[in-house]
Amino acid sequence: MKVFYVTAECWPFAKTGGLGDVSYALPKELKKEGVDVRVIMPKYSTIPSYLKDQLKEIAVFSVRVGWRNQYCGLLEMELDGVKFYFIDNEFYFRREDERKSIYGYGDDAERYTFFTDAVLEAISRIDFYPDVIHINDWHTGMLPLILKERYATLEGYKNIKTMYTIHNLQYQGVFDKHVLYDILDLPQKYFDNGDIEYYGSINFMKAGINFADKIITVSPTYANEIQTSFYGEQLDGLLRKESGKLKGILNGIDYDLNDPAKDKDIFVHYDVDSINKKVENKLRLQDILGLKKDSSIPLIGIVSRLVSQKGFDLIAYMMPELMREDLQIVVLGTGEHQYQSMFNYYDSNFSDKVSARITFNASLAQQIYAASDMFLMPSLFEPCGIGQMLAMRYGSLPIVRETGGLRDTVTPYNKFTGEGNGFSFKNYNAHEMFFCLKNAIKVFKDKEKWIKLVENAMKTDNSWKKSAKEYIETYRDICD
């Protein structure tokens, strides 16, 4: 099985969100399972120097973008047994603000159309004709259509299948209609028949949904949710129409990078057989953050983008009530000004209960996972979610709303059987969240029950191994 994995970002080269994590971890696991997988992405100027120094140029060619030809360099390197290729063009992938974000530029449609065309041209240059091209999110959504329109009759290309993973339906790549002629150079019929048209504009994600052989979302529940008007972002009708090729496969987490038994960022190592050592991380973090050192006070962790999607409206509404409870909250993240200001206020005025770090610090994130007793994720919607899986890996019990991947990964505590690996509530309601949290605190005070739940959480298999096997099975299905 040969798979060409096409992504706009991949850790450790360039990462803005979960796509970057998946693009590193999934191919690595696929390789372990015997798949000949190769990854291709843009060569951004922000790739760390120690990695840039390892890149080797293997080809130079021109790529046609609309009416013009553009230079394209092709470079390669190997990391963790996986071969990575990089599409080089400084006009598109060297930006002054790239350190802040690799996306969000006025010419993004042109940048990622160039990237898509370059990927298809690169296939013959590296003599790697895959069984499946696996594309991700809106940036590469046009690839199946361009493959069909320009390459379908070429030797080596005609039997290639495409799989399209939607990591977040909210970001669709919607651009002005002129993109069709000036950049994509595609026939008018694809706009007129609605295949890529979206309220008078061009929609890259819609193209991917229509023309890919298989559509994947990052959890089974999210695959169902996006077929409804509430979650469907105005593509729910199309997704219902294409439901026969839609499937949800949960993301995993990298168990090598996230292991409390050997994580270099945490204070004290522990595993499921030495859970009693976890509390040392809590006491150390309380001390560092200026919170009262007390193992009996439940410590609630939040590591997240501070945006409305993540349920911070609910938290903001209940903060006055939460401040009356015997608990501590540690927050790490950046995002919308209103939530940053809210957490800064409580950090200043309730410093014995709240510590807010309005930044992102990877080491501190790991320390919060290891130190916290509970991990709060009351998301409005959550395609998959990584935080709850990392929390379970480190023995911090997730408190989540039952949506998307949160519903698929967190089994709520059953007080009659003692089963479960976290706590959950159903409706997007602040008081439901609050009562769920209070229930978790009540169970926390019963150490025997709590330790059993922590053991359940740490034994939950959220590794990429399970997910990779599902992907391989799906690759085979579309190739048969």
Curated annotation (Swiss-Prot):
<dbReference type="Pfam" id="PF08323">
    <property type="entry name" value="Glyco_transf_5"/>
</dbReference>
<dbReference type="InterPro" id="IPR001296">
    <property type="entry name" value="Glyco_trans_1"/>
</dbReference>
<protein>
    <recommendedName>
        <fullName>Glycogen synthase</fullName>
        <ecNumber>2.4.1.21</ecNumber>
    </recommendedName>
</protein>
<dbReference type="InterPro" id="IPR013534">
    <property type="entry name" value="Starch_synth_cat_dom"/>
</dbReference>
<keyword id="KW-0320">Glycogen biosynthesis</keyword>
<comment type="function">
    <text>Synthesizes alpha-1,4-glucan chains using ADP-glucose.</text>
</comment>
<dbReference type="GO" id="GO:0005978">
    <property type="term" value="P:glycogen biosynthetic process"/>
</dbReference>
<comment type="similarity">
    <text>Belongs to the glycosyltransferase 1 family. Bacterial/plant glycogen synthase subfamily.</text>
</comment>
<keyword id="KW-0328">Glycosyltransferase</keyword>
<dbReference type="GO" id="GO:0009011">
    <property type="term" value="F:alpha-1,4-glucan glucosyltransferase (ADP-glucose donor) activity"/>
</dbReference>
<dbReference type="Pfam" id="PF00534">
    <property type="entry name" value="Glycos_transf_1"/>
</dbReference>
<feature type="binding site">
    <location>
        <position position="15"/>
    </location>
    <ligand>
        <name>ADP-alpha-D-glucose</name>
    </ligand>
</feature>
<dbReference type="InterPro" id="IPR011835">
    <property type="entry name" value="GS/SS"/>
</dbReference>
<keyword id="KW-0808">Transferase</keyword>
<comment type="pathway">
    <text>Glycan biosynthesis; glycogen biosynthesis.</text>
</comment>
<dbReference type="GO" id="GO:0004373">
    <property type="term" value="F:alpha-1,4-glucan glucosyltransferase (UDP-glucose donor) activity"/>
</dbReference>
